């Protein structure tokens, strides 16, 4: 996995995200990565989940791979490194899928020389752009990525 990431949201681990030992549950790691995806689109003015005419268009997940390297702890300063990878027929031009790579790092301690960065997790997931019927609760069809989404992704992919 390349280490060239362009979008790096930061926050601190909240008490509610931990167990009694102060360790973050693994499901939070995936939530942090997904929140970074949402922030990525929001920062670019793209509404990546829309409802119009009773139809929802968004990105259901079709594949996920994650490696949990070290535990995250209460009050760790977390940096989520995320980047999109367009996939499809013409290098993204006619694609319906987006893959995302992520690395989550905790900055810990301050021993006078700064913080130590500890890798918490890394992984990748793939989503497809699809349309669902909200009333019926069914996936209707996979659609080509809209041009505005391809533009938002292409400068970082």
Regions found by a protein language model. Name each.
Residues 1, 46-54, 104-116:
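Intrinsically disordered, low-complexity boundary segments flanking structured domains
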Residues 2-61, 130-157:
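Hot-dog-fold acyl-thioester-processing enzymes
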Residues 5-9, 36-37, 55-64, 74-80, ...:
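A generic structural signal for short beta-strands and their flanking turns/coil linkers
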Residues 14-19, 26-30, 34-37, 64-75, ...:
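Residue-level signal for functionally critical sites in structured catalytic/ligand-binding pockets
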Residues 68, 72-77, 85-157:
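HotDog/MaoC-like acyl-thioester-processing domains
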């Amino acid at each position: 996995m390349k280490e060239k990431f362009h979008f790096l949201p930061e926050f601190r681990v909240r008490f509610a995200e931990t167990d009694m030992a102060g360790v973050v549950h693994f499901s939070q790691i995936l939530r942090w990565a997904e929140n970074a995806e949402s922030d990525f689109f929001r920062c670019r003015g793209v509404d990546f989940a829309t409802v119009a005419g009773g139809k929802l268009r968004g990105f259901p997940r079709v594949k996920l791979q994650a490696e949990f390297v070290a535990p995250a702890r209460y009050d760790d300063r977390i940096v989520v490194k995320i980047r999109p990878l367009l996939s499809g027929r013409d290098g993204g031009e006619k694609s319906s899928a987006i893959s995302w790579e992520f690395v989550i790092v905790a900055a810990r301690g301050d021993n006078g020389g700064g913080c130590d960065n500890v890798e918490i997790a890394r992984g990748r997931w793939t989503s497809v752009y699809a349309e669902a019927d909200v009333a019926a609760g069914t996936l209707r069809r996979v659609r080509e990525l809209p041009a505005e989404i391809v533009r938002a992704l292409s400068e970082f992919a």
